[in-house]
């Protein structure tokens, strides 16, 4: 079962879509958020969660202090329901804004006008490198200076290049999961 790990909604269980998703494990999410908290990289930020599925990554960020979270997945019913449940736990004086959009990620990125401080990108493992590169190219101009992109892929995925405006900081493997920490600029 997927759950919010910490923050105002800590330990709240989240529903997981039943259409063949691969939710990010608690272990990997804990590693992501420990690294982000060490950088003081959550509080007050604008966060984008692409291929959000259950919305666990974006909603974890909301629970830990992100000001605005956008969840994007072509099938958004589960993330929308989870967002409603998480927001019921939010402090009444300063709740985060959570927007859930049900549309293909590439279509969203091409039409997006906002910019973000932190982006989670967890596409299906069977997505090819061309799709990922298209997403990153469309995203690059929407990143704020110093923005962080956390890309989750299979640890067996071949190496790839990065578009102009995005550079690899590091890669860390957790079993079958590889996290690519990317930086804007």
Sequence positions of predicted segments:
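Class I S-adenosyl-L-methionine-dependent methyltransferase catalytic core
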Residues: 1-185
């Amino acid at each position: 079962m997927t759950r919010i790990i910490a923050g105002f909604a800590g330990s709240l269980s989240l529903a997981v879509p039943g259409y063949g998703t691969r939710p990010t494990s608690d272990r990997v999410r804990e590693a992501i958020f420990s690294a982000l908290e060490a950088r003081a990289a959550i509080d007050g930020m604008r966060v984008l969660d692409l291929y959000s599925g259950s919305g666990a990554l974006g909603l974890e960020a909301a629970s830990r202090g992100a000001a605005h979270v956008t969840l994007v997945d072509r099938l958004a019913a589960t993330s929308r329901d989870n967002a409603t449940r998480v927001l019921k736990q939010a402090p009444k004086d300063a709740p985060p804004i959570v927007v859930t959009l049900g549309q293909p990620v590439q279509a969203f990125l091409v039409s997006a006008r906002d910019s973000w401080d932190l982006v989670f990108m967890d596409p299906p493992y069977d997505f090819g490198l061309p799709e990922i590169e298209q997403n990153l190219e469309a995203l690059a101009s929407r990143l704020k200076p110093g923005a962080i992109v956390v890309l989750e892929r299979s640890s067996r995925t071949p190496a790839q290049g990065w578009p102009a405006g995005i550079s690899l900081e590091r890669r860390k493997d957790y079993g079958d999961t590889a996290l690519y920490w990317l930086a804007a600029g």
